[in-house]
């Protein structure tokens, strides 16, 4: 009894550095007054479980409870085994769903002498999914069969999920087909997994066979069509769900359909979804909905609605994606000045830009002919925010310089791009600028660079041939055409929309 009570003050240590509510709960745990050592142990274990459930997203809280659990001697107790297992499972769940899932497997390995239940293996399989570790998933599958939990529906569903996430769809379907009883979650996991990996026909077939379709089921199949760049089918399913089936789209449903709306430029649907989101309170409760609406309005050609929605959103709700979305919106509409103004306001409110923000800014400068401003943003990106440009940033800069006729600067920049990220698109961008400005000398140098990297694309030969022809060098143009024939390189035929 004395030994058990001496361990209670350890809880004061793990309270340090945590939130007030967490510390208060721990303080309460240290002042429990049970009648027996077993009751003390059970109440402490229950309190630790409660703390984990309240702070499941905190790695610090999880690790500190984990540490106390190990050092307290609970593991060597022959009593309160059900409470010990509950705490272990809660720890596994926190680790499996958090940012450090590997720690769940390490915890299980260190405690493999305990008698686990089906929930243990469910959480471990979610860990494998989070780690994208098919090898660990296969090992756990074998272990599940060995310990006799292979017929538990939650374990089977977790197996389907782990296999589907890892792309092992044959194994996922095998487990799914062997299940005598499937719940809605199992169906949704299988449909979503198949759709995610591009097996839309099979996914849709399962969707049609599903006994009861929920909003999650509809969202999974809609998201699949959107991901596979089939927006018309996605929009058709969305209408069918909302209008004909009478199922109210969730926030996730809206996030799944926005890319399809943007691809086809369906402004009326965008407006309808906006109105629906307002009625359901999604636009206020979820900033991702607002950000997606801003982006969709801009891609549907309505920059006025995108700008109005951004301005109507309170400063407290706006995040980095909100600012980047409106900057990108102005950029795609050629409104470079407005994009830069939003960037200045963004800095004023203390929001730190990322590489996507700068990419949008450089895009705006390129399409707006704002070369000096673009170069200043490059300098700010490098020196003020220590962001290293990637190939997309370089592509924007070379396009910007090329449009402005500053070809020597563009070539110098292209030659300075690190070899490990340089690709042929950079040189093709510069070749396009050479063609526009009839710069034969540089065009030849750039074409030589392109052919060192890739010889099979006919468009490069044609473009250089056109440069020659544009300045009256018809012999050189003909020579390049003959070289195409000699190398059996074909020009991709164009087509008219008329």
What residue spans do the PLM features occupy?
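Terminal (and in a subset, N-terminal) low-complexity or junction segments at the ends
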Residues: 1-183, 192-197, 201-214, 223-498
């Amino acid at each position: 009894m004395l030994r058990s009570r001496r361990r209670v003050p350890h809880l004061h240590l793990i309270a340090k550095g945590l939130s007030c509510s967490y510390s208060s709960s721990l303080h309460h745990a240290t002042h429990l007054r049970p009648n027996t050592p077993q009751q003390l142990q059970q109440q402490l274990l229950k309190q630790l479980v409660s703390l984990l459930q309240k702070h499941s997203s905190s790695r610090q809280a999880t690790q500190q409870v984990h540490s106390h659990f190990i050092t307290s001697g609970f593991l060597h107790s022959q009593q309160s085994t059900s409470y010990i297992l509950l705490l272990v499972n809660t720890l596994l769940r926190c680790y499996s769903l958090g940012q450090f899932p590997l720690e769940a497997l390490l915890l299980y390995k260190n405690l493999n002498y305990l008698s686990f239940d089906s929930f243990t293996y469910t959480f471990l399989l979610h860990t494998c999914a989070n780690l994208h570790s098919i090898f660990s998933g296969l090992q756990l599958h074998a272990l599940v069969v060995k310990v006799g939990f292979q017929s538990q529906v939650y374990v089977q569903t977790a197996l389907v999920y782990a296999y589907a996430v890892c792309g092992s769809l044959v194994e996922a379907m095998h487990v799914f087909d062997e299940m005598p009883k499937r719940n809605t979650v199992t169906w949704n996991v299988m449909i979503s997994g198949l759709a995610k990996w591009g097996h839309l026909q099979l996914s849709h077939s399962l969707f049609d066979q599903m006994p009861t379709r929920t909003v999650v089921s509809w969202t999974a199949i809609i998201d699949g069509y959107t991901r596979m760049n089939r927006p018309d089918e996605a929009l058709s399913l969305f209408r069918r769900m909302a209008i004909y089936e009478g199922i109210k789209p969730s926030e996730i449903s809206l996030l799944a359909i926005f890319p399809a709306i943007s691809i086809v430029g369906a402004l009326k649907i965008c407006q309808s979804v906006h109105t629906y989101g307002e009625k359901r309170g999604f636009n206020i409760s979820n900033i991702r909905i607002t950000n997606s609406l801003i982006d969709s309005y801009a891609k549907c050609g309505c920059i006025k609605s995108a700008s109005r929605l951004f301005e109507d959103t309170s400063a407290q709700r706006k995040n980095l994606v909100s600012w980047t979305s409106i900057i990108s919106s102005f950029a795609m509409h050629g409104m470079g000045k407005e994009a830069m103004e939003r960037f200045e306001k963004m800095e004023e409110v203390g929001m730190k830009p990322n590489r996507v923000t700068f990419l949008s800014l450089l895009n705006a400068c390129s399409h707006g002919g704002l070369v000096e401003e673009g170069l200043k943003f490059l300098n700010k990106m490098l020196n003020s925010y220590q962001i290293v440009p990637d190939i997309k940033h370089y592509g924007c800069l070379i396009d910007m310089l090329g449009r402005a006729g500053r070809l020597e600067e563009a070539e110098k920049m292209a030659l300075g791009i690190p070899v490990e990220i340089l690709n042929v698109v950079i040189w093709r961008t510069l070749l396009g600028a050479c063609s526009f400005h009839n710069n034969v000398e540089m065009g030849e140098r750039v074409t030589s660079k392109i052919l060192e990297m890739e010889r099979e694309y006919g468009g490069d030969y044609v473009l250089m041939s056109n440069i020659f022809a544009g300045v009256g060098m018809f012999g050189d143009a003909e020579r390049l055409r003959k070289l195409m024939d000699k190398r059996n390189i074909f020009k991709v035929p164009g087509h008219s929309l008329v």
